[in-house]
């Protein structure tokens, strides 16, 4: 089975630089994935990407060295299994608030004896190899999103679930959970403390700490806090920010448009 290079990056003490694809188009995904990302995550939770679009995007990303990942819309067996069968080499699941929810997610994403995933890989065999079923539990990554006070409270028990590779922080939802405006670079002390605590606890257990950011400056800050899986905004936001700054610069204005939210 094709190896998941993200595991080796982490093993070597490196940081995963992850792209985020929200435009439901295979050509856009292909161009974006050629930027040099370690991985590109297709987002099926927020935005217009459905399974059919995601399938073409997975194929497009596979023309590059980027590892194809997906964020599922919810902790649902059907879509979790379909995306893994389609060749996603990892999944990020939103709103995991309890150990039981994490166990359910892992069960859907792992073949027996670790889980209850049904046998039926289709495109995954073309991408990963005929022995996919033998190595999928070891190569495919599963991340639980921590973005609520409940998830934060239950972090230790969530991280104890066998078969879970790490967590992924949604700073905007986490900020809102603390009664603050949504932002990818929180300034509130409570939210910052929560972000730091999540990384500290996760890394102490030898697991991967992931987080969404608004760009390189915030990503580097999160690296300093212990995060080793870092997303830099998304393709739609990157396109709009870059285009807006091109227009401003051409007009002699300050090219200072930045990504404030997702």
Label every PLM stretch briefly:
Residues 1-262:
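Expand to "…catalyze enediolate/carbanion chemistry for C-C bond making/breaking, isomerization
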